């Protein structure tokens, strides 16, 4: 159980763990590349360790010590048929991107995960991969895990995705790299583009045209050194802590500021928050900066439309900030929250309400009333890492002690979260 006390101030200079999305892809692409890939700044959280485990079961040598990883790549067809099921744990990224890779392989594989993964929709990925020629089955005609995949010769497709999802786009692109001809994906809005950037870093040609990204089949990846920046989704919790605790300021070093992920920065600024980007630079095709965050009086805003895919994971902690903003904050167009580790609309509302916050669910988001005094509460993370951390930030401003049950879920993306919170809280 995580115990959080009310904080007087947040101060210091810190780094957050490596970016989860980039860490997954570095291991996957390193395994498929020819030659050695070294990774520094890897996130040694449960989800990324699941990705390592899956590739080890297919004969790839991977050495991991803390945030340093070495992958001995064997090329696209160097993977071996696993003798056991591939267990992705709690990782939606692992199962969806791996589905695209497995669709290209000349063998059979079964992928499964934990209870949360068993409830998450897979047909959005399976449908286009079937169109390309992969034989894939699962519960309810491939809607749910376990997934049985027999890969083979694939044909490139031009796919119009009904959702802006980096996982869907990435699975199709990865399958497309070994399909005949050109494969393209067009999205309704831009989603995260870590796959495109990292494929280019590994020597793959990727063509972008507006909302469409395309790759030609038959391309090879070349092993290389990768430096993973800090995860902006993890930094978001510390940014929020500074915004809600008066008199606070924090320098967060080496954070990835990929434009497809910086919705949180835009929202903080729109609410009146002070956040400066220092020492901006490019590392492995990814933009990186140090963030200087200073406490500010916030005001409520409306968050909707194209920005939602750029901050979907940050909505739980944005809701916490909104409780301390003057006026009302409205979040719309965020139906995707319902199919995360939990139904995050329902979970944010139920847990934040325990503090005495004024928060109302809607079909596609929530309405948060500010400015509200919070009282310490007993919170259940429901096994969702982002809910656990968001409620811990609420605990920093709540009167009395806050207890968070099922806090082990936090290790999925932010090992050492509680220790860091104690270090910067005064």
From Swiss-Prot:
Uppermost EC category: transferase
Pfam families in alphabetical order: EPSP_synthase
GO cellular component entries: cytoplasm
UniProt name for this protein: 3-phosphoshikimate 1-carboxyvinyltransferase
Membership in a protein family: Belongs to the EPSP synthase family.
Reaction catalyzed: 3-phosphoshikimate + phosphoenolpyruvate = 5-O-(1-carboxyvinyl)-3-phosphoshikimate + phosphate
Keywords: Amino-acid biosynthesis, Aromatic amino acid biosynthesis, Cytoplasm, Transferase
Oligomeric form and interacting partners: Monomer.
Keyword Amino-acid biosynthesis: yes
Subcellular location: Cytoplasm
Gene source species: Brevibacillus brevis (strain 47 / JCM 6285 / NBRC 100599)
Active-site residues, Swiss-Prot/TrEMBL: 313
Gene3D superfamilies found in the cross-reference section: Enolpyruvate transferase domain
Highest taxon above the source species: Bacteria
GO BP terms in the entry: amino acid biosynthetic process; aromatic amino acid family biosynthetic process; chorismate biosynthetic process
Function: Catalyzes the transfer of the enolpyruvyl moiety of phosphoenolpyruvate (PEP) to the 5-hydroxyl of shikimate-3-phosphate (S3P) to produce enolpyruvyl shikimate-3-phosphate and inorganic phosphate.
Assigned EC number: 2.5.1.19
Sites where the protein binds phosphoenolpyruvate: 20, 92, 120, 167, 344, 386
SUPFAM superfamilies for this protein: EPT/RTPC-like (SSF55205)
GO function terms (MF aspect): 3-phosphoshikimate 1-carboxyvinyltransferase activity
Protein residues bound to 3-phosphoshikimate: 20-21, 25, 165, 167, 313, 340
Alphabetized InterPro entries for the sequence: Enolpyruvate_Tfrase_dom, Enolpyruvate_Tfrase_sf, EPSP_synthase, EPSP_synthase_CS, RNA3'P_cycl/enolpyr_Trfase_a/b
Pathway the protein takes part in: Metabolic intermediate biosynthesis; chorismate biosynthesis; chorismate from D-erythrose 4-phosphate and phosphoenolpyruvate: step 6/7
Primary location recorded for the protein, binned into one broad class: cytoplasm
């Amino acid at each position: 159980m995580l115990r959080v006390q009310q904080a007087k101030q947040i101060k210091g200079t810190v780094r957050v763990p490596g970016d989860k999305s980039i860490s997954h892809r570095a291991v996957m692409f390193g395994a498929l590349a020819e030659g050695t890939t070294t990774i520094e700044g890897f996130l040694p959280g449960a989800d990324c360790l699941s990705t390592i485990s899956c590739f080890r079961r297919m004969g790839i040598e991977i050495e991991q010590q803390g945030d340093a990883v070495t992958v001995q790549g064997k090329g696209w067809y160097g993977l071996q048929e696993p003798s056991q099921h591939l267990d992705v744990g709690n990782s939606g990224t692992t199962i969806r991107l791996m589905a695209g890779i497995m669709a290209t392989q000349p063998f059979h594989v079964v992928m499964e995960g934990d209870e949360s993964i068993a409830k998450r929709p897979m047909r959005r990925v399976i449908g286009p991969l079937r169109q390309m020629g992969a034989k894939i089955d699962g519960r309810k005609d491939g809607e749910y895990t376990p997934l049985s995949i027999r890969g083979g010769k694939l044909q490139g497709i031009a796919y119009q995705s009904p959702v802006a999802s980096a996982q869907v786009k990435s699975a199709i692109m990865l399958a497309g790299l070994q399909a005949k001809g050109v494969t393209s994906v067009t999205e309704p809005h831009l989603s995260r583009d870590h796959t495109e950037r990292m494929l280019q870093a590994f020597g793959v040609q990727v063509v972008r045209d507006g909302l469409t990204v395309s790759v030609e089949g038959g391309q090879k990846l070349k092993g290389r050194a990768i430096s993973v920046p800090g995860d902006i989704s993890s930094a978001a919790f510390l940014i929020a802590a500074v915004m809600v605790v008066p008199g606070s300021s924090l320098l967060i070093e080496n954070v990835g500021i990929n434009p497809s992920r910086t919705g949180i920065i835009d929202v903080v600024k729109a609410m009146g928050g002070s956040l400066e980007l220092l020492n901006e630079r490019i590392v492995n095709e990814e933009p990186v900066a140090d963030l200087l965050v200073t406490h500010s009086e916030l005001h409520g805003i409306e968050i909707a439309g194209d920005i939602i895919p750029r901050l979907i994971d940050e909505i739980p902690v944005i809701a916490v900030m909104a409780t301390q903003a003057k006026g009302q904050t409205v979040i719309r167009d965020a139906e995707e929250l319902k199919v995360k580790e939990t139904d995050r609309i329902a979970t944010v509302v139920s847990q934040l309400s325990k503090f005495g916050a004024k928060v109302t669910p809607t079909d596609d988001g929530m309405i948060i009333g500010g400015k509200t005094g919070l009282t310490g509460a007993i919170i259940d993370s429901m096994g969702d890492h982002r809910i656990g951390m968001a409620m811990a930030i609420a605990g920093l401003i709540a009167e009395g002690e806050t207890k968070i049950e099922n806090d082990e879920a936090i290790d999925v993306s932010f090992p050492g979260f509680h220790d860091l919170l104690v270090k910067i809280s005064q």
